[in-house]
A protein has these predicted regions:
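Conserved small-residue
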Residues: 2-699
Length: 699
């Protein structure tokens, strides 16, 4: 049992402490709170919120995600905080109120709504065109609110974490370098592609200088005190596809777009269009040294370009450095970078140089629980899995000679593809370094061509004290655009063709060697309802492993599914409500504690849940294990500001842990006022420190 009384969520679970015969009476009514709800005896302090001052002239960004405390002394150090994206509805509703600046939001939104398909190619407009200038201003503000915040903090005598405002406090944003000269640097083979003076695609003329970093979702902290920051859903900001030489598709291929519609999450896409961003410079791993006020980030291209999530880092003396990461897309791969050189002292900052040379591998999972690593290099054979091996019956492969990708649904087409292209090098052009760079730039599609296993949205990757790797696979559903997981590896417990609710996998390298080329794997936790064998959560996302090996996990259900009414599990036409829409049963995104050893191993205990429309992200434990830092992202994303404490009563067709159906009446706040929690307060993404009131370790 955990050292806390689990929080009661909306769904009966085996670990709730409510006996089977009392579940219907105990769960027939439920009230959701617009707050961070924690067990009795725990509290939280707000450290920083969107709009707070950073340095002399900057402000804390939007949608904080991964965070890391790099301690420079006991209970003192730097918080490195990612800012993933902006949530268009609450961001545009409250920007002037919070930031104090007027943006031409209404005019541009109206223009986008009136444009064909809601899209405007601002890059094709004249520089002095008023519409282009307005789109530029909004895109610049949105990109500024992404990136990274570095703030100094310490725990005071009362046990409360507070900011100390050091000279190293700073922002690295999506527009760093655009006007201030603070370009990001790069290492590795893709730099040779960035330096091309001419090529098949768009070239920004900046060579290896890179403007900014954006879509910064998850990350990882190195033993030597730097932070690896991911660039995830860059494909919504800049063109993802590339040509065979690794150069980018034109700016016009991803116009500016203001997405809005019934049942949709409002979004502002194509922000790189007006700003002139070269697509192949985004989707990388950025290394930051928080204590160096002059460090504005380095993109290490040997780690590949894809929709990066968290990093599992193994740095052991006398061994090669190993960095794991997942590509968070439906059909995304698990990757491993292995350095050419070896680690001498895991705490030496010289280890950053090891990220500049090595090899990137993608995982091949076998259904029998074994697997191997496939090198993404020019002489690797082309050998993709068949489309029919996947849940959705489709795989995406590099398209030649046109560039970009093509969807393949016919098993017979794979043989023809292999006949035409024998190795990965046949799919890309340039000298040896440029060709390797192009493979890394196109990592996901190169990995598909090489036969790496398409998986179920791999999000966080974390290393346990014994060297085991834990991976959160968020969702096993298919996508008509991206693809889907391998159906013999990612199986639904109910016999259905796909499983939306996710898994947590444990992977052990052969001989526990970070550089091993083979491994074993097993699923150790399953999302879903208890009656189906699940643990009561949906869509596991970020992981944090404590000193005892226990997993702290947060969920990432799509905001539009939170508390969506499920009055019946059968639709009016007699068909079943989809797994995706059943996620309304699970309430808000939540926080869980999962022991990995002892009598409670593999059980999941709810530690809490977040405010309305939010995702609780970036769990990070202080070295003394007394503080859990969390980033509360996008409160109010779907409904915006909660007006006059509005709420609705909704019906949910719930099930007990043994499958008996009953109806739950649930009161649901509409929108959010967190963290202020006063009527009509603007919802603001914020970083919090969770602690026990008595100051003891969390668990």
């Amino acid at each position: 049992m955990p050292p806390f009384t689990p929080v009661k969520g909306p769904m009966p679970v085996e670990t709730s402490g409510v006996s089977l015969d009392r579940q219907i009476s105990q769960y027939s009514t439920y009230t959701v709170k617009d707050d961070v709800v924690l067990p009795t005896g725990y509290t939280y302090d707000i450290i920083a919120s969107w709009g707070d001052k950073v340095g002399t002239a900057d402000h804390f960004g939007y949608n904080n995600d991964y965070l890391s405390l790099v301690e420079t002394a006991p209970n003192e150090g730097y918080l490195v905080v990612n800012h993933e994206y902006i949530s268009a509805k609450p961001w545009s509703q409250t920007y002037k109120q919070v930031i104090g600046v007027d943006l031409p939001l209404a005019e541009v939104k109206a223009a986008a709504m009136a444009a064909p398909d809601g899209k405007i190619d601002a890059s094709s407009l004249l520089n002095n065109d008023p519409l282009r200038q307005k789109i530029y201003a909004i895109s610049k503000a949105a990109q500024y609110d992404q990136g990274i915040s570095i703030i100094s903090v310490r725990k005071n005598a009362n046990g409360v974490w507070e900011r100390t405002y050091s000279r190293a406090d700073r922002r690295i944003t999506g527009i760093s370098g655009l006007e201030d000269g603070r370009y990001l640097k790069s290492t590795g083979p893709a730099t040779a592609v960035f330096k091309k003076a001419s090529g098949q695609g768009f070239i920004d003329g900046l060579g290896d200088k890179i403007i900014g970093t954006h879509q910064n979702c998850s990350g990882g902290t190195t033993p030597w005190g730097t932070v690896l920051v991911s660039e995830e859903n860059f494909q919504g900001e800049v063109p993802e596809p590339v040509y065979a030489d690794g150069t980018s598709f034109p700016l016009s291929s991803l116009p500016f777009q203001w997405v809005t519609g019934e049942g949709e999450i409002e979004d502002i896409m194509g922000q790189g269009n007006a700003l002139g961003y070269q697509g192949n410079k985004y989707g990388w791993t950025v290394e930051i040294d928080p204590v160096n006020p002059n460090d504005f980030g380095t993109k290490h291209t040997w780690l590949g370009r894809y929709r990066h999530e968290g990093y599992g880092i193994r740095a052991e003396a006398g061994k090669r450095l190993c960095v794991y990461s997942g590509c968070d897309r439906r059909s995304g791969h698990l990757y491993k970078f292995v350095s050419t050189g070896t680690v001498r002292d895991p705490k030496s900052k010289a280890n950053s140089r090891l990220l500049e040379d090595g090899m990137l591998y993608a995982a091949k999972f076998n259904p029998d629980g074994t697997g191997r690593w496939i090198a993404l290099k020019a002489d690797t054979p082309v050998n993709p899995d068949l489309p029919s091996a996947h849940v959705g019956g489709m795989i995406t492969l590099p398209k030649r000679p046109n560039g970009g990708v093509e969807k393949v649904t016919d098993d017979g087409a794979i043989a023809a593809f292999k006949d035409q292209f024998k190795t990965l090098g046949d799919l890309y052009t340039g000298n040896a370094t440029e060709k390797q760079g192009a493979i890394l730039i196109d990592a996901h599609f190169a990995a598909n061509a090489a036969g790496a296993t398409c998986t179920a949205r791999p999000e966080d990757t974390d290393i346990a004290p014994d060297g085991s790797l834990f991976i959160a696979f968020t969702s096993g559903s298919s996508s008509s655009s991206d693809g889907s997981p391998h159906k013999e590896v990612f199986k639904a417990p109910t016999g259905e063709s796909q499983w939306e609710y996710g898994w947590i996998m444990k992977l052990v390298e052969t001989n526990n060697d970070p550089a091993a080329m083979t491994f074993r794997w097993e699923m150790m936790a399953l999302g879903g309802e208890p009656a189906d064998g699940g643990l009561g959560f949906a869509n596991p996302d970020n992981l944090e492993i404590d000193a005892k090996g226990n997993i702290w996990m947060v969920t990432d259900m799509s905001t539009d599914k939170h508390n969506t009414e499920v009055a019946s599990r059968i639709k009016s036409d007699g068909s079943k409500v989809s797994q995706s829409n059943l996620r309304g049963l699970y309430g808000n995104n939540s926080i869980w504690y999962i022991p990995t050893s002892g009598p409670s191993a593999g059980e999941a205990y709810m530690f809490g849940y977040g405010p309305m429309d939010c995702e609780t992200t970036g769990p990070f434990l202080s070295k003394d294990q007394t503080t859990l830092f969390l980033a509360v992202q996008h409160p109010g994303e779907y409904h915006g500001v909660r007006e006059n404490m509005k709420s609705e009563v909704r019906k949910f067709a719930m099930r007990t842990t043994d499958g008996k159906e009953f109806m739950q009446t649930r009161e649901v706040p509409i929108g959010s006022n967190w963290p202020g929690k006063q009527p009509n307060d603007p919802p603001k993404p914020s970083v919090i420190a969770v602690r026990r009131i008595n100051g003891a370790p969390l668990a």
